[in-house]
């Protein structure tokens, strides 16, 4: 397939949140590093950029993040050992919404 626009990867994924601090702490606990935090005056939103290796997430507190069908509800992370990561998550304080791994 022709790459007529010169796209070479994903720069970042933007995720709305209702609690920026809680979201930042969650991603930090997974090993992400906060590379920038700011305030978007035009939108009236606190913003944070988090990075792990070459993967970047922008999260912004807009007070309108919905947990419903059609809402952006997950980010897929590539890991070195999915079984080990799943066990670590299950053993931590996180809510696990599936009882087994789903390989795609």
Predicted features along the sequence, with ranges:
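Basic/polar N-terminal segments that are highly enriched at the extreme N-terminus
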Residues: 1-4
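Core segments of cupin and vicinal oxygen chelate
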Residues: 7-8, 14-56
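Vicinal oxygen chelate
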Residues: 8-19, 48-51, 65-90
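Acidic-residue sensor for enzyme active/binding pockets
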Residues: 58-61
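A common structural junction motif
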Residues: 93-97
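Conserved small/polar residues in nucleotide/adenosyl-binding loops
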Residues: 102-104
């Amino acid at each position: 397939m022709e790459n007529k626009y010169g796209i070479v990867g994903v720069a970042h994924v933007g995720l709305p949140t209702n609690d920026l601090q809680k979201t930042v702490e969650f991603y930090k606990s997974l090993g992400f590093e906060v590379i920038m935090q700011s305030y978007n005056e035009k939108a009236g939103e606190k913003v944070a950029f988090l990075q792990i290796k070459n993967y970047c997430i922008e999260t912004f507190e807009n007070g309108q993040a919905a947990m419903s069908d059609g809402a952006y509800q997950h980010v897929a992370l590539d890991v070195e050992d999915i079984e080990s990561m799943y066990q670590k998550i299950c053993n931590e304080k996180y809510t696990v919404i599936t009882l087994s791994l789903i390989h795609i």
